[in-house]
Regions:
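A short, exposed loop/beta-hairpin motif centered on an aromatic-Gly-Thr core
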Residues: 22-31
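Short aromatic-glycine-(Arg/Gly/Cys) micro-motifs in beta-strand/loop hairpins
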Residues: 6-21
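Short, charged, surface-exposed hinge/linker loops at domain edges
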Residues: 1-4, 32, 36-68
Length: 68
């Protein structure tokens, strides 16, 4: 099964990893470690909460107004 991962640099160093399909999130000292941790966390999540088959994920962007 192929899922999505969003990796974001953490303020304190390392990376935060998020899987949008399940909502699982974790962190790691490197992008590779964060992704490995996300894989493990997501596998554990899916043992309890299997995904319902869907048409896939649509990743897009949107803008918000900037506030001063």
């Amino acid at each position: 099964m192929t899922l999505s991962a969003v990796l974001t640099p953490a303020e304190e160093g390392g990376f935060v990893a998020l899987n949008p399909e399940t909502g699982t999130a974790t962190q790691g000292e490197s992008a590779e470690e964060a992704l490995a941790n996300l894989r493990e966390a997501t596998e554990l999540y899916l043992e309890e909460f299997p995904l319902v088959k869907s048409g896939g994920t649509l990743l897009t962007t949107f803008e918000v107004a900037e506030r001063a």
